[in-house]
């Protein structure tokens, strides 16, 4: 199973590389931001990345399924879960605080994951039981209690708006 998981990770990294290129391509131009029925924002990058993932999964792993934020495909014990642009609201406003995230869930267990920040060229990867990495370097989680890690952040999305 370990070699298989490494293969899945390589696949996920390839998808992430393409996703990062798409995110950068649309970032400084008209990104086609619009509202979905649930009032959340979607951009051209979201839909293009999601469609690309489904195409590639169908080609390489036709028995797997995809649960993408913008579109789903198939029903399987092997599910690629994707948020093509995690942070779409910021991305749509040309604020570089968004990432691509993809995980492979096998029989309900997250086994492989990648998160790419295309604005800092940071690629985070993990295989269950093998640790987490940033750009190939092992990283560690801290042991702080959650309540000790509270952060408050404020910014104006609409400068000049009459609140």
Predicted regions span which residues?
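A short, compositionally biased
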Residues: 28, 98, 126-130
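N-terminal subdomain of lithium-sensitive/metallo-dependent phosphomonoesterases centered on the IMPase/IPPase/PAP
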Residues: 1-85
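Residues that scaffold the ATP/ADP-binding catalytic core of kinase and kinase-like folds
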Residues: 26, 90, 135
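Acidic beta-strand-loop-alpha-helix segment within the catalytic core
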Residues: 103-163
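Glycine-rich active-site/cofactor-binding loop and its immediate structural neighborhood
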Residues: 80-120
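Short polar/acidic secondary-structure junctions
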Residues: 71-73, 94, 105, 144
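Short, function-defining helix-loop hinge/capping sites that tune catalysis or transport
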Residues: 54, 91-94, 125
């Amino acid at each position: 199973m370990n070699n298989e998981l490494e293969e899945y990770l390589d696949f996920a990294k390839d998808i992430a590389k393409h996703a990062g290129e798409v995110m950068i391509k649309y970032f400084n131009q008209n990104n086609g931001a619009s509202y979905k029925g649930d009032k959340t924002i979607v951009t051209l990058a979201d839909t293009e990345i999601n469609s690309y993932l489904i195409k590639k999964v169908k080609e390489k792993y036709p028995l797997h399924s995809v649960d993408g934020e913008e579109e789903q495909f198939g029903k399987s014990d092997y599910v690629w879960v994707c948020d093509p642009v995690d942070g779409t609201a910021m991305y749509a406003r040309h604020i570089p605080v968004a990432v691509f995230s993809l995980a492979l869930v096998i029989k309900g267990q997250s086994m492989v994951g990648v998160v790419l920040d295309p604005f800092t060229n940071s690629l985070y990867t993990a295989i269950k039981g093998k640790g987490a990495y940033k750009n190939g370097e092992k990283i560690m989680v801290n042991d702080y209690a959650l309540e000790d890690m509270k952060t408050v952040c404020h910014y104006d999305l609409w400068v000049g708006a009459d609140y």
